[in-house]
Structures are given as structure tokens and as C-alpha cells.
Amino acid sequence: MERISQILDNLSKIKSLSGKENQMGEYLHSAYKKYVDRIVIDNRGNVFFHKDALNLENCKNVMILAHMDTIGVMVTHIEENGYLRIDKIGGIINSVLLGKKIEFIKENQIIPGIVGSIPPHVKGNDNISNGMSELWVDIGARNKEEALKDNIHRRLWCHIK
């Protein structure tokens, strides 16, 4: 059987944003089908593994529960200067996003970016907290046309590194 460190490494490399957990479900199904008697995938994509007891007398039921999804962001608007406006996918605190490296994944193409905002001293106040409307992603595009050439578009999801 795989070592737990290898299992965790494999699982952490899968991009499984909220609402797009199918890749994780497929990995779990293929990797662990040899250890169980039945696998059920329901209409919401949840994966259930069943291992029958060898001895039904005095057997205990055990359940292990885990999320298959991760948080992320989605493009809501492309600015003329090439910056991307974003919104959250899943429960994440806005301030946690600031300075995070992210990856847009589109058809085997990975487009890296970093989340930024206008610093408080430039905004003219000491309020460090940023609403989503104050955050943007820099992907290195010099303008909107360059961002569009990189296949960036509204509703494109991305993974937070």
C-alpha cells in the first residue's frame, strides 16, 4: 500500500475547485478501487467507498469523511490595462488572497498570476482590509488584448497555490 506521504502528495497536486471536483473523484476511484468492495458515485459527484467486514459479529462501522474541493477565484472582468478582476469560489477571506500566486488552467495551458491591490498609503487611508472589488490579478499582460490572447475570459476559474 502507498505511504501516507505519497497519497497526500498525489491528492494535493489535483486541481479540484468547488463545483469542478470530477478530476479528484476520478483519481480516487481509480487509485483506491482495489482496496474496497464497492464504490458509489452519486449525482452530485460524491464518492463513497464501501469495505465489507470479514466478520459481521461484533464489527464496527467506520466512516472517513473529507472534502474533495478547494477554494479558488474566477475572472469577472478584464481591465483595459490587462489586470483581471476576480470573485471568490468557496469560502475564503478576502485578505488571505492578497499576494497569493494563482494558476489559470485552460486546455493544458497554465497561466500564472498574482493577486494584488492598491496599497493603503496610496489609497489615502489606513484601512488594510480589501473588498473583492479592490483586488485584481496581474498575469503579465500589458493590456486587455494581451490577456485575451492568453485565452483569459470571464468566468475562467483558477487555482490558488
How should these model regions be labeled?
Residues 1-161:
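N-terminal hydrophobic/helix-forming segments and targeting peptides
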